[in-house]
Regions:
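A surface/extracellular/periplasmic glyco- and lipid-processing/surface-interacting theme
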Residues: 2-269
């Protein structure tokens, strides 16, 4: 019920459900492709789907029925869970449950691992570049999301491609993030010739925080869904805060640019 308004809700993608399987996610989507359908069926998962629940769990924004922008929130989703035979309660880890029973302890409260390895203070490696105040991520659809660093707030404000602020629908103020994470993954075409499959075991990436830039490597973690390493291969815990994560593949021409205040490209050697 704490989930804020999110959207537009679009096609479900098995990439995200696979990546976040350890988080016990509740898929929320508006339809899906065959690969996602097969994944959900294989693992006996059911999504809250706008094509099934319609306006019982989703709103369509200020558009007419011919071109709705489907959005939802935690309260709206919670209202339809019982009718879909779904629950938002966390499942108990079988191994932990067995250990508690054997030791005679009170059963542990189910938890999920953190998504990101974070810290509130502690050592950080030297940044690979300073003055990282402008960033742009180009996605395969041709759309570009931009960010500008605000030294007063220490956050990266989100911008539309034309430079206008991207407003948070819940607060009506510009969306802003403490951390920008751009993660790269090797990708290969699937047999339908249109969609891509991704390597979810490891890849490279960038971390921006406080106007600084680090080159990182990511893998699947144990204490958290992701594990990060700095340019020297040492474990890295990013600073706690609101984080934006962009996922870029290796085949579709997606790209990221990071610039200083003078417009110099910080990713060029």
């Amino acid at each position: 019920s704490a989930m804020p308004t999110v959207g537009p809700v679009t096609l479900g993608q098995d990439l995200f459900w696979r990546l976040l399987s350890g988080q016990q996610v509740l898929p929320i989507q508006r339809g899906c492709d065959l690969y996602t359908r097969n994944f959900l069926d294989y693992w006996n998962l059911r999504a809250v789907d706008a094509l099934e629940t319609g306006r019982n769990a989703f709103t369509t924004g200020n558009t007419d029925w011919a071109s709705p922008l489907w959005c939802t929130n935690g309260q709206s989703v919670a209202k339809v869970l019982s009718s879909l035979s779904l629950s938002s309660a966390l499942s108990e880890d079988p191994a932990e449950s067995a250990d508690s029973t054997q030791e005679g302890d009170t059963p542990a409260v189910p938890t999920v691992p953190a998504l990101l390895p974070q810290q509130t203070d502690g050592h950080l490696p030297d940044a690979d570049a300073a003055g990282a105040v402008q960033a742009a991520v180009q996605f395969p659809s041709g759309s570009t999301t931009r960010f500008a660093y605000d030294t007063d707030t220490g956050t990266y404000g989100m911008l539309h491609n034309d430079g206008s602020p991207q407003l948070d629908a819940n607060t009506s103020i510009q969306a802003a993030f403490d951390n920008l994470l751009v993660l790269y993954s090797a990708s290969t075409p699937r047999d339908d010739g249109r969609t891509l499959d991704y390597d979810l075991t490891m890849g490279g990436g960038l971390w921006l925080n406080g106007g600084h830039l680090w080159h990182i490597t990511w893998t699947q973690g144990t204490g958290s869904t992701f594990a990060f390493y700095d340019a020297d291969g040492r474990p890295l815990r990013i600073l706690s805060g609101r984080s934006y994560i962009a996922w870029l593949s290796s085949l579709t021409g997606e790209e990221v640019t990071v610039q200083d205040s003078a417009g110099n490209d910080l990713l060029q050697p």
